[in-house]
UniProtKB/Swiss-Prot annotation:
Record-given protein name: Na(+)-translocating NADH-quinone reductase subunit E
Residue stretches spanning the membrane: 11-31, 39-59, 77-97, 110-130, 140-160, 176-196
Enzyme class, broadest EC rank: translocase
Key words of the record: Cell inner membrane, Cell membrane, Ion transport, Membrane, NAD, Sodium, Sodium transport, Translocase, Transmembrane, Transmembrane helix, Transport, Ubiquinone
Subcellular location: Cell inner membrane
Family: Belongs to the NqrDE/RnfAE family.
GO molecular function terms noted in the UniProt entry: oxidoreductase activity, acting on NAD(P)H, quinone or similar compound as acceptor
Any one biological process term the GO annotation gives: sodium ion transport
Keyword Oxidoreductase among record annotations: no
Length: 198
C-alpha cells in the first residue's frame, strides 16, 4: 500500500506533467483564464488519464508486447497509433457525456475538449507507463495521480491569472508574457519537490 501512496504523491507533485515535464502546455495556457473552466478541463483530463493509462496498459501487455499474442511476434511498433486510437475513443465518449449531461461545461471548453485527444500530457502518461513497466494497479494510480497533478497546476495558474487581472502588469508583458513568467515561477516551486525520495 505504501508503494501506491508513494507513486500517487510522486505523480502529483514530484513528476507533475505540466510543471516538471511541461506536457500539455497548449491547453494549459489557453484554458487557464478562469478557475471554473480550468477546473472542468482538469476533471476531464483526470478522467481521461485515469481510464486511458490502465486501458493502454492492458492493450500493451495483452496484445502489443513481445510474445503477448504469439511466441516470437512483437507488435510494439504499433504502440503510438494504438495508444492514440484508444485515447481518441475515450475522449469521444467523454465529449458525448459532457454534451449530454453538462452542456455549459461542454460549451465553455469548446475546441479544447477534442484537443485532449492530442494533449501530450495524456500521451506522456501512457508512454511513461510503458517505459516504467507499471502493472495494472500501478497504472491506475499513476494515471489518476498524473491527472490530479495536471489539474492542480492548471487550477492554480487560473487562480493566479484571475488575480493578475487586477494588477499593474507592464504593457509589454500583458497576456502570454506574464503567463509564461508565472508558469516558470510555478515550475521552480514544484522543482523543490524533486529532491524528495519516496
Amino acid at each position: 500500500m505504501e508503494h501506491y501512496i508513494s507513486l500517487l504523491v510522486k505523480s502529483i507533485f514530484i513528476e507533475n506533467m505540466a510543471l516538471s515535464f511541461f506536457l500539455g502546455m497548449c491547453t494549459f495556457l489557453a484554458v487557464s483564464k478562469k478557475v471554473k473552466t480550468s477546473f472542468g478541463l482538469g476533471v476531464a483530463v483526470v478522467v481521461v488519464l485515469t481510464i486511458a493509462v490502465p486501458v493502454n496498459n492492458l492493450v500493451y501487455n495483452l496484445v502489443l508486447k513481445e510474445n503477448a499474442l504469439v511466441e516470437g511476434v512483437d507488435l510494439s511498433f504499433l504502440n503510438f497509433i494504438t495508444f492514440i486510437g484508444v485515447i481518441a475513443a475515450l475522449v469521444q465518449i467523454l465529449e458525448m457525456v459532457l454534451d449530454r449531461f453538462f452542456p455549459p461545461l461542454y460549451n465553455a471548453l469548446g475546441i479544447f475538449l477534442p484537443l485532449i485527444t492530442v494533449n501530450c500530457a495524456i500521451f506522456g502518461g501512457v508512454s511513461f507507463m510503458v517505459q516504467r513497466d507499471y502493472n495494472f494497479a500501478e497504472s491506475v494510480v499513476y494515471g489518476f495521480g498524473s491527472g490530479v497533478g495536471w489539474m492542480l497546476a492548471i487550477v492554480a495558474l487560473a487562480g493566479i491569472r484571475e488575480k493578475m487581472k487586477y494588477s499593474d502588469v507592464p504593457p509589454g508583458l500583458r497576456g502570454l508574457g506574464i503567463t509564461f513568467i508565472t508558469v516558470g515561477l510555478m515550475a521552480l516551486g514544484f522543482m523543490s519537490f524533486s529532491g524528495v525520495q519516496l
